[in-house]
Amino acid sequence: MSLNNPSPLRVACDGESSSGKSTAAKLISKKYKLFCMNSGLLFRYASRLIIKHKPKKIIPFLRKKFKNLNYKYITRLNLHSQEISNHVAFLAKQKRVRQIIRIFQKKIIRQHHQICCEGRDQASAILNKNPRYDIAFFFKCNPSTAAYRRWKDLKTSNEQITLDEVKESLKKRNELDVKRRFSPLIQSKDSIIIRTDKLNKKAMVTKMSKEIEKKLLLKYGRNFRTK
C-alpha cells in the first residue's frame, strides 16, 4: 500500500529503549512505502566510529564522517552490540554531537517528503518545525518485557549477557535519556501512545494505520487515497 496523493506525510515515532518503536517504524514504512530513518542507528554508528578509531578530537572527526554519509550504508551494519549500547547513552548527551546528527537528519528529511522518523526526540526536536510531523506516536513497554526482547536479540548475536544485566542497562539508558539537558526523551502533547506490551505486531500496525489514515483524511479530505 502506498499513497496516491504525492503530498508530504511525515510520521514521528518516539519511545524508550526496546519499546518496539523500531519494529513499528519499519512495518508502517513498508505498508505506506515511506522512507524509514532510525536516529538511534546514527548515534550507534557514531559510537562505533569512536570506539574503533579513538579520535583525539571527536567533534571534527564526526563532522567529517557524517558530511557525505550514505544512510543505507549504516543500515547494513551490526550496531547493536552491548559495547556500543553502553557507549551511546553518554555520547547522546553531548550537545555538539546531537547537532551534527541533527543536521544530517534534517538533510534526509528534506530529501524525502514521505518519511517515518524513529528515535527519542523526533517529535520534540527533529520534526517539531520546518517541517513539522503530520502525526506522532510515543511507544511504551513494560520494563521486563522490553528487557526480555532486547536480551533475545543479543542472544542471537552471541552476546554473553544476562537478562538482569540487560534490564539494568535499559533502565540506566532510559534515565539518561529522560534527564539529559539537550533533546531529552519526552512525549509531545499530541503524540498517540502505543503500548507494545499489550499489542502484537498486527494489532500495533492496525492501530497506527487507523490513526494515520484518520489524520490524512482530515488533511487531504476526499482526495486522500491509498493504493
Give the ranges of each region predicted by the language model:
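Walker A/P-loop
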Residues: 22
